[in-house]
A protein has these predicted regions:
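N-terminal leader segment of winged-helix/HTH proteins
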Residues: 1-39, 131, 144-147, 153
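Extended, non-catalytic scaffold segments that flank or surround catalytic motifs
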Residues: 15-30, 62-63, 98, 102, ...
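A cross-family signal for key residues in well-ordered alpha-helices
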Residues: 22, 49, 64, 111, ...
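Alpha-helical linker/hinge and terminal dimerization helices associated
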Residues: 24, 28-31, 66, 109, ...
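N-terminal helix-turn-helix DNA-binding core of bacterial DNA-binding proteins
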Residues: 26-72, 153
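Charged, amphipathic alpha-helical coiled-coil/dimerization segments
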Residues: 56, 78-135
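DNA-binding alpha-helical recognition surfaces that contact promoter or target DNA
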Residues: 75
Length: 153
């Protein structure tokens, strides 16, 4: 998928952070589809990783860990469950909570896709100071989140 739209933006768009971030995400999503998996999405991969890292964690807690809202998380979990990658079990004593478990197939997919993700990230960040770059991106996320939550600009 060509995400470039034919030309590079000029003038004010090149200096508009929201536009640049959207373009970066478009390019990342296109690279993910081509080099990682055309069906499994980044958010789905994040949920699989969290389910693997935190066995028997509930769906709401994973949503918070991977920064997904409740309705998106419910859709992601339904899709993963439909593909046999996770199973959801009602928590004992609390019928509203769903515990997530990675299935054997989910574990296999996580291993395979995880290797592709690692290679993609190595290629994307080749030559860059990866740690400094990710620190800066995470700092921007925190700052922009605080602005979205009502902090003064």
């Amino acid at each position: 998928m060509d995400t470039r739209g034919g030309t590079r933006p000029s003038g004010p768009l090149r200096g508009a952070p929201g536009h640049v971030v959207r373009r970066l995400h478009q390019a990342y999503a296109a690279a993910w589809t081509r080099h990682v998996d055309p069906v499994l999405t980044g958010p789905q991969f994040a949920v699989l990783m969290a389910a693997d890292d935190f066995p028997e964690i509930d769906q709401g807690s994973i949503a918070a860990r991977v920064a997904l809202d409740r309705s998106t998380m419910a859709d992601v979990c339904r899709r993963l469950e439909d593909r046999g990658l996770i199973r959801r079990v009602t928590a004992p004593g609390d019928g509203r909570r769903k515990l997530l478990y990675l299935t054997e197939h989910g574990s296999e997919v996580l291993t395979t896709v995880g290797e592709r993700v690692r290679r993609l990230h190595e290629e994307m960040l080749a030559g860059d100071d990866t740690n400094a770059f990710l620190e800066r991106l995470n700092g921007l996320v925190e700052r922009w989140d605080s602005l979205a939550d009502g902090a003064s600009a």
